[in-house]
From Swiss-Prot:
HAMAP family from the UniProt entry: Prokaryotic_Ku (MF_01875)
Gene: ku1
InterPro entries: Ku70/Ku80_beta-barrel_dom, Prok_Ku, SPOC-like_C_dom_sf
Gene3D superfamilies registered for this protein in UniProt: 2.40.290.10
UniProt similarity note: Belongs to the prokaryotic Ku family.
The name this protein goes by in its record: Non-homologous end joining protein Ku 1
Keywords, in A-Z order: DNA damage, DNA recombination, DNA repair, DNA-binding
Length: 261
């Protein structure tokens, strides 16, 4: 299966530079649905509605706002955001190596694979092997899609994996969650230890499946055999019709609804 790259550049540290491509390591297996109109099966479209003026808002009148209190916002323009946005990274520059065992999994965000590009295969394999033997990971800052990430680059099954990490101020404290220490009977401790020992097994994710997703897919396959899928009607677009005309039409509908309340 061909995997589409979402970024290409180099991974570097000291005098080493390896050309790589970033690809997704996880394909989310959720079953997604579109919302349809039950009368004609047309896919429903999302529109922006202003409750104050009771009208649809065209794209050129939509801005961002940062909420600073109940019903209080600080407007901000695209130009202002662009002025503080970091430049897109061309290099994943490792600033230090760490022991991966020291990284609490709660800091893990999204995993990606780093695929070697032409000319970088030998250095790539060498880095994979060294990091595997030492169980070390490279720590770096990396900009993707106008967001600056903290990332860990590690060796996984013969390949380099890049894991985006949460920043420390994003991880919530467990101080209010952990129960206070108390006296636990020796037989209770012994029983828990025995249960854990009896249930020990090697990690094998292939033993488990998303049963709900599988049942939904079976349901869909059954429905396809029993009943042909419906087709949404073609929407004829009149000459000159565009977003402004659509908004005007929707506003007219809203006015009619208000009259009939």
């Amino acid at each position: 299966m061909a995997v589409q790259g979402i970024w290409s550049g180099t991974i570097s540290f000291s005098l080493v530079a390896i050309p790589v491509q970033l690809v997704k390591a996880v394909a989310i297996g959720r079953v997604s649905f579109r919302l349809l109109h039950d009368k004609d099966y047309s896919p429903l479209a999302r529109r922006m509605f202003c409750p104050e003026q009771e009208k649809m808002v065209p794209p050129d009148e939509i801005i961002r706002g940062y909420e600073i209190g109940p019903d209080r916002y600080l407007p901000i323009t695209d130009e202002e955001l662009e002025s503080v946005s970091p430049e897109r990274s061309r290099t994943i520059e490792i600033v230090e190596f760490i022991d991966m065992n020291e990284v609490d999994p709660i800091y893990y965000d999204h995993p990606y694979y780093l695929v070697p590009l032409k000319g970088g295969e030998k250095a790539y394999r060498l880095l994979v092997e060294v990091m595997r033997r030492t169980n070390k990971a490279g720590l770096a800052k990396f900009v993707l899609a106008e967001r600056e990430y903290l990332v860990a680059v590690k060796s996984t099954e013969g390949a380099l994996t890049l894991i985006t990490l949460h920043y420390s101020d994003e991880v919530l404290s467990d101080e209010d969650i952990a129960p206070k220490e108390g006296k636990i009977a020796a037989e209770v401790k012994s029983g828990i230890k025995k249960s854990i020992k009896n249930m020990m097994a090697d990690f094998n994710p292939g033993k488990y499946a998303d049963e709900r997703r599988d049942k939904v897919m079976d349901l869909l396959k059954k429905k396809v055999k029993e009943k042909a899928p419906v087709a949404a009607p073609e929407v004829e677009k009149a000459e000159g019709e565009g977003p402004a005309d659509l908004i005007a039409a929707l506003e007219e509908i809203m006015r009619e609804v208000k009259k009939n309340r």
